[in-house]
Amino acid sequence: STKKILLALISILIFLNATEYQLSTHILDINSGQPASNVKVELYNLDQNRQWVKISEKFTKKNGRIADFLPYEKTENRSFGVYKLKFYTKDYYISHKVDSFYPFIEVSFELLKDQKHYHIPITLSPFGYSTYRGS
């Protein structure tokens, strides 16, 4: 029917216009065993003067993820250089009535020209954290 064809065309157009993102993050609270939702995360770039410049601020979703840092549409538009993510963990733990040692966590990393996507996960507890390059 015409409705089905129209819906299929709309779906294809949405898919073709979907923005891809070069950087994502995920926070898992290993104290509770749950994703850490509503955590403020700031993204900074180290400029040519060796100064940190804030380029984005987002909050983790219910699943503890932010999937949409650094949008790009073509290979030549990929960002590269030194970046850092700043996770406001104390605010998260205050909202859960838990004492925490770290007021925030900063993770610095380098994006290379030849890499498509970077994922920076954090496993977090009130008195420790771990991170790695995910996929």
Regions found by a protein language model. Give the residues of each.
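Sec-dependent N-terminal signal peptides
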Residues: 5-15
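Compositionally biased low-complexity segments at domain edges in trafficked proteins
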Residues: 115-135
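N-terminal secretory signal peptides that target proteins for export/translocation
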Residues: 1-2
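Beta-strand-dominated extracellular/periplasmic modules and repeats
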Residues: 19-110, 119-121
